[in-house]
Amino acid sequence: MDLDSLVMMKNSTLTSFSLLALMALPTQAYAQSSSQSEEAFIHSLYAEALDVQQGYQWLDDLSTNVGPRLSGSPGDSMAVLWAVETLDSLGFDRVFTQAVDVRHWQRGEETADFESASGSKVLHVTALGGSVPTPGGNGGEGITAEVIEIVGRDDLHAKGHLLKGKIAFFNEPMDPGLIRTGSAYGRAGWQRWGGASMAAKYGAVAVVVRSLTHRQDDFPHTGAMAYEEKVAKIPAAGISTNDANWLSSELKTAKNGHFHLVLGCKEKKRKTSYNVIAEWTGSSHSDEVVVVGGHLDSWDLGRGTQDDGAGVAHAMHALWLLKQSGYTPHRTHRIVLFANEEFGLDGARAYANEGLEAGRKHVIALESDGGSGAPRGFSVHDVPGAIEAIKPFDKQLARYGCRDWAIGGSGADVGQIDDDGVLLIGYRGDSQRYFDYHHTAQDNMDSVHPRELEMGSASIAALLYLLDKNLVSR
C-alpha cells in the first residue's frame, strides 16, 4: 500500500497527533528543500554500503565466530563481548551495557519415530523453546502414544474428547495465499505458542507442531512456547513440514500407529545478560533520543544470522554510515542491541523501564527483526499522524525499493518503548524466503545475499537522516 492510500485511510484520526505536536513537520518547506545535495547524500549512503559491505563483514563475524546466542548460554555472553568490542572500535561517544535478568533453557536429546503395521519412520523434530522434557530426559524412555491430528482451533475443540493419553499433532499450515509472510506466521503461530496447554486441558500427553514455514523440507523449526498456569506441562516439539505431510497422510491409513518422542531439554537457573548500547550525542537536541536496534540473542539450532544477526548488522551499519559520512546529528542517536527477545523481551523491557536518564525522551525508535531481505519499506506504529510524519520522504526512498509503507508492526523490542509521542518504525525487507530459515539449523550465512543486506542498512540510514534533518524539534 502506498503512503497516499494510507493517509487517506487514516485521515479521520490525523487531527489530534501527539507526535506532530512534539515534532511538527513543515511539509512545504521540506518539499522546497529536497535538493539535489540531499539526494546526493542519500545516494552516497547506498554507494558506500554496497562498495565496502561493512555490515556484511560484521554479520559474518557474529555468525561465524560467535554463532548461536540463546539467552543464558556461553554464546550469549560471547555476543555481548563481541558487540562491546566492535562498537568500541567505531568511535561513538560512549558504549555501555545494561544488565538484564534472562531465562536459561537448554536443549538436549531430541528424537522421534512413528511405527505402525506398515513399518516405522524416523522423523525430524526439535524441542520448542521452553518445553519440559519427556520422562527420563536425555536417554530416558520418552513418550509413546497414539496421535490425533489437529488442523485449526475448531478441530481442536471438536476432537478434544479424543486426546486423553494421546499426542496432539497440530498441523495447520501457514496460509500460502497471504502476501505478507509475517501475517501467515502470526495466524498459524497459536499452535506453537499455546498448543501444549490447550491440548493438555483435554488430557494430551505431548504435542507435535508443524513447523511455521511455507517451505517443504526436512528442517524442523523451534521457537518459544508457553504454559498456562495451573495446567499440566507437557512436552512440545516442532516437526519438519515434509514429515508433517507424511504423518498426516500416514494417519489416514495406519492402524494402531504409535509416535515415540524423546526430548532431553531442561530449564536452568536464570542468568545475567546485557543490552549493549552505543551513543552518538546530538548537536542541538541531545535530550531527544533516536534508537535503532535489533536483538543480539538468537535460537540455538543455526547461527542466528537472519534472526536477528541481520538486524544487529543493520542497526550498527546504519548509524556507522551516517557517522563516517561526516553528518552531524541534531538528536542523540543510539544503537541498542537488545538481550533475550526470543524468550520474553527481557532486554527491551529493561531498556524501556530504565535505559534512559531523567530529562531525556525517546522521539524515534526503529527496529530491524525481519531478516536480510532487500528493502521493501517501513511499518509505522498505529499512532494518529505517524504516516503523515514520514510521508514526505516516500519519493526519496522509493527509488531504492522502499515502496511498501504499512501501519502497525514496528517490532517487538521497540514496541516496549512507550514514551509519549515516540515514533515507532519497523524495517520491512523482502520476506518471501525469511521463514525458510527462521528458527532452524539453516539460519546461517549461506542464506544472506550481501547486497540485499547492505541495501537494508542504507535504507535505514537514509530514513534516520531524513527524520533527524527535517523534523522540527519541540
Which stretches of residues belong to each language-model region?
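N-terminal capping segment at the start of a domain
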Residues: 39-73, 219-224, 297, 364, ...
